[in-house]
A protein has these predicted regions:
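Glycine-rich flexible loops
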Residues: 1-200
Length: 200
């Protein structure tokens, strides 16, 4: 995500393992080494262990609320953040936009999510969508694994750019229900290819 410009000094990623998740340390993702030690957080935890990002509550709450999610990415996509601040919805205007949901939800609290209760509210706002924009505070994307979550974050920012241009040019028209269902059915295949591109 760092190479794609989605994270700078801030951002984190995690993957689920049984009744816990492993999360990156609170340091720039682009500085991590392949042998970097990740922290394990139990999904039954009442408090976060030392050395994890304060916003690990975001991951904790989403994993508890979404059994289908195996990976989460937290990043700072600029265009998506700007559209949320301007009240412009991010809609599926192109096929890959369907990977995010029928409209990307926005979490209205711009403060860092550093407590359990706020994390739970964010997870409720995400619902069954593929991504959520945190107004004034970046975004979070989910996937069956962490690679697909990173790919979905890339799609979020790409889709935000398309929405920005479409809104400036006229009245954006989302893809049809039939088209949405088709693209949703091939999401993992296409997201896998995007992840391969991001790793290249």
């Amino acid at each position: 995500m760092a190479a794609a410009g989605l994270v700078t000094a801030f951002g984190h990623a995690s993957y689920r393992e049984d009744d816990a998740f492993h999360i990156t340390p609170p340091k720039p993702l682009g500085s991590l080494q392949p042998d970097e030690t990740l922290s394990r957080v139990s999904l039954e935890a009442e408090e976060l262990p030392a050395g994890v990002p304060g916003e690990a509550w975001v991951h904790w709450a989403i994993y508890r609320n979404r059994p289908d999610v195996g990976g989460i990415c937290r990043a700072q996509p600029q265009t998506a953040t700007a559209l949320a601040s301007a009240g412009v919805p991010i809609l599926p205007l192109h096929g890959q936009g369907a990977f995010l949901g029928r409209e990307v939800p926005v979490f209205g609290d711009a403060r860092l999510v550093r407590d359990r209760k706020t994390g739970e509210r964010l997870a409720e706002s995400l619902s069954d969508a593929g991504a959520l924009v945190m107004r004034g505070n970046g975004a979070v994307a989910v996937g069956a694994d962490v690679g697909l979550a990173a790919a979905r974050m890339w799609v979020l920012e790409h889709s935000a750019g398309i929405n920005q241009k479409a809104a400036a040019a006229g009245s954006p028209s989302p893809i049809s229900e039939e088209e949405f269902a088709y693209w949703d059915s091939v999401s993992e295949e296409i997201l896998g290819r995007i992840w391969a591109y991001l790793k290249s």
